[in-house]
Every structure is written in structure tokens, then in C-alpha cells.
Design a protein with these regions (language model features):
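Phosphate/adenylate-binding glycine loop and adjacent helical scaffold
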Residues: 1-100, 104-105, 109, 120-125, ...
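Conserved phosphate/anionic-ligand binding catalytic regions in large, soluble enzymes, centered on
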Residues: 119-137, 208-220
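Short helix-capping/linker segments at secondary-structure and domain boundaries
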Residues: 136-147, 221-226
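A short glycine/serine-rich beta->alpha loop
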Residues: 115-123, 169, 199-208
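Acidic, carboxylate-rich catalytic segments that either coordinate divalent cations
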Residues: 178-226
Length: 226
């Protein structure tokens, strides 16, 4: 219980080269933290990606949470989404990824509808959009990512500071390590290790890992359809 320990809203925060100090009582060290960047993926083969997506659909079906947006990973399933209001907006975002001839104003409506949508400290809609930007970076779809990131920035006042920080990182192609591991397994069709990556992904937030993965899957499918 952080409140019982003396932590209060609006306590002053000071960040040094090795610690984060909060008020006069707490100091969190990151002295031993090491910089990390996801490994680039350079071999994009349509057949391999399609096989990886098929393996994901099979292995993730019984693992994916009912909450959030993970049911969109399984387009032909009888699973019911917990956020049906997202269906139309996700279709619009998918069309943008497939076409790519849009500007930020054209996709601002679906982005605005998704920002702040769903459960979690980083809401499901935010994580979904972050997953799309990460995937676009990996696929070197620079202009599409720039347009989407611009729309996200315009709508980001509807979410919280922590989620905005994650979205900013996603616009640069950076997410949680288990997400990148799962993406690598899918793109390279490493189905023998995919389940282990999914189990680590499952531990991210309320359902944030799955929501971000949904954005990745939507993007990969749209990319294959181009």
C-alpha cells in the first residue's frame, strides 16, 4: 500500500544519474540498468510471415484474454469482443495501413475513438495503436508510421501521461521486450518458441501485451494484403 507508506499525490520528484527520488522517503535506483533496443528484423518473407500468423492464431487461441482487443487476432472465430465499439474503428485503421495514401486528418476520427478506450493503465486502444506503429517501423513503412503518429499525437490528450510515454516510444519502434520477441517469432515463423514468448507477453499489464500484439497482427495482415 503505497499511500500507507507515505507516498502522496504531487510529491516532488527528482531524477539523478542513478536514482529517482520521490519526496524525502523513496529512492529507486536504476544504476545497473542497461540501455536496450529491439533487434532489427531484416528478412521479410510473405510466406514465412503468413505461416507465423497461422501458428500464432492456433497457439494463442486458448491463451488470449476475453478483455481488451485480443479477439481481433482471430477474425473467423466465434469469440466475442469485449469492446464491440472498436470494430468499425479498427477496420478504418486497417484500411489506412493497406492503402497508405492518407494524411493525419483522414485517420484522426478512428484514432480519437480508440485513444483511451478499454481497460488498463495504458488503455487497450492506446496499446493497439502502439502495436501498429511498432510493426510499421519494423516493416520500414516510414511514411505510414509518421502519419499515424501525427494523428495519435493530436488525439493523445484523451489519455494519461504514462500511456502517452508508451505511445511516443512506439512511434520510434520501441515496445516491451516480450512483445518484440513475439513479433520476431511470428515474422520468422519460430513456432517452436512462440508459446513461451506469448506466456511472457501475457504478463504485460492488464491485457496490454495482447492489445499491442493485436495491432501488430492487424498490420502484418494488411501488409500481406497489399
Amino acid at each position: 500500500n503505497w499511500q500507507a507508506s507515505g507516498l502522496r499525490l504531487d510529491d516532488p520528484v527528482k531524477i539523478s544519474a542513478t536514482h529517482i527520488h520521490i519526496g524525502n522517503r523513496f529512492a529507486f535506483s536504476y544504476r545497473d540498468a542497461e540501455p536496450w533496443q529491439p533487434d532489427p528484423i531484416t528478412n521479410f518473407n510473405n510466406t514465412t510471415i503468413a505461416a507465423g500468423l497461422a501458428a500464432l492464431t492456433e497457439q494463442a487461441h486458448d491463451m488470449a484474454p476475453a478483455e481488451g482487443l485480443a479477439t481481433f487476432i482471430f477474425p473467423n472465430s466465434s469469440l466475442t469482443t469485449a469492446l464491440p465499439s472498436a470494430t468499425t474503428e479498427i477496420a478504418k485503421i486497417k484500411s489506412f495501413v493497406e492503402a497508405g495514401h492518407s494524411n493525419a486528418e483522414d485517420i484522426l476520427e478512428p484514432v480519437t475513438a480508440l485513444i483511451g478506450l478499454g481497460p488498463g493503465l495504458t488503455p487497450s486502444g492506446d496499446d493497439f495503436l502502439g502495436g501498429i506503429m511498432i510493426a510499421l517501423n519494423l516493416l520500414e513503412e516510414v511514411e505510414k508510421c509518421r502519419v499515424l503518429a501525427s494523428a495519435v499525437e493530436n488525439a493523445a490528450s484523451a489519455t494519461n501521461d504514462i500511456s502517452r510515454a508508451h505511445l511516443n516510444a512506439a512511434a520510434r519502434g520501441v515496445g516491451a521486450e516480450p512483445l518484440h520477441a513475439t513479433i520476431g517469432d511470428v515474422i520468422s515463423n519460430r513456432n517452436h518458441v512462440l508459446k513461451a514468448s506469448l506466456e511472457r507477453l501475457d504478463a504485460i499489464g492488464h491485457c496490454s501485451g495482447w492489445d499491442a500484439l493485436t495491432g501488430v497482427v492487424i498490420t502484418l495482415r494488411a501488409w500481406l494484403a497489399e
